[in-house]
Amino acid sequence: MSQQNGNVNRVGAQDRVGASGGMEHSFGFKAVDENEKQGLVNDVFHKVAKRYDIMNDLMSAGMHRVWKDAMVAWLTPSKRPGWTSLDVAGGTGDIAFRIVEVSGRQAHVTILDINGSMLGVGRERAIKKGLIDNLEFVEANAEELPFEDNSFDAYTIAFGIRNVPHIDKALSEAYRVLKPGGRFLCLEFSEVELPVLDKVYDEWSFRAIPRIGKMITGDADSYSYLVESIRKFPKQQDFAAMIEKAGFERVSYRNFTGGIAALHSGWKL
């Protein structure tokens, strides 16, 4: 794999899970039974669905929009008719809309999310943007995709895979539904690698985000979970190893904003 481009005394310091996984037993910093996690995560996203963009603005200081643009630019969606993409955990449509627009409205994107509230927001936005004809909305689980093998030219997931209980299953399903030659791209909050920025970002995340979330939405707990889930997610190198283990080749990643987020790529060859 290639890269392009000490938690001591830090606020909220926690050990991240490694390449062997373990996210199924953590709901943020809280240890839970793996059968509980999906329901707990669903509750969070039912609560934040209407204000999901605000949530991402808080988590990234507004940078998520730039990162998403870069993600779609690296994907380079085809402008040929019939090119298809699956956007998982994509309920509100941010990535799918960009793909359709960059493709000159040639691409067909299936937006899949386990949360109906998020899909409802995405469908409303798609209608307002006039993009509904290029989109399909599917409520389903990333660990058990309702599609045949070799169905899609691309698979994208942005800020969603850390909320999947069994990440290894989601990666295996991504590999299965991609066509030979298909591309996997995952954008996710990650391990900050700049010594000063990591401390600043921790202070912002643990001190400010839950308080601001409560002021705006009346809900601090959901924002605390989202911050904590970022700190449990595997480091860049460990997640890249998980992607390789699922069968992908030419695995690489790019750090954004000092590692606050990372964009991972792999190919089904």
Swiss-Prot record:
GO terms for biological process: aerobic respiration; menaquinone biosynthetic process; methylation. Pathway: Quinol/quinone metabolism; menaquinone biosynthesis; menaquinol from 1,4-dihydroxy-2-naphthoate: step 2/2; Cofactor biosynthesis; ubiquinone biosynthesis. One of its GO terms (molecular function) is 2-methoxy-6-polyprenyl-1,4-benzoquinol methyltransferase activity. Keywords: Menaquinone biosynthesis, Methyltransferase, S-adenosyl-L-methionine, Transferase, Ubiquinone biosynthesis. SUPFAM superfamilies: S-adenosyl-L-methionine-dependent methyltransferases (SSF53335). CDD domains: AdoMet_MTases. Its EC number is 2.1.1.163, 2.1.1.201. InterPro entries: SAM-dependent_MTases_sf, UbiE/COQ5_MeTrFase, UbiE/COQ5_MeTrFase_CS. It catalyses: a 2-demethylmenaquinol + S-adenosyl-L-methionine = a menaquinol + S-adenosyl-L-homocysteine + H(+); a 2-methoxy-6-(all-trans-polyprenyl)benzene-1,4-diol + S-adenosyl-L-methionine = a 5-methoxy-2-methyl-3-(all-trans-polyprenyl)benzene-1,4-diol + S-adenosyl-L-homocysteine + H(+). S-adenosyl-L-methionine binds at residues 92, 113, 141-142. Coiled coil: none annotated. Belongs to the class I-like SAM-binding methyltransferase superfamily. MenG/UbiE family. HAMAP family: MenG_UbiE_methyltr. Methyltransferase required for the conversion of demethylmenaquinol (DMKH2) to menaquinol (MKH2) and the conversion of 2-polyprenyl-6-methoxy-1,4-benzoquinol (DDMQH2) to 2-polyprenyl-3-methyl-6-methoxy-1,4-benzoquinol (DMQH2). This is Ubiquinone/menaquinone biosynthesis C-methyltransferase UbiE. The lineage of its organism: Bacteria, Pseudomonadati, Pseudomonadota, Alphaproteobacteria, Hyphomicrobiales. The gene is ubiE.
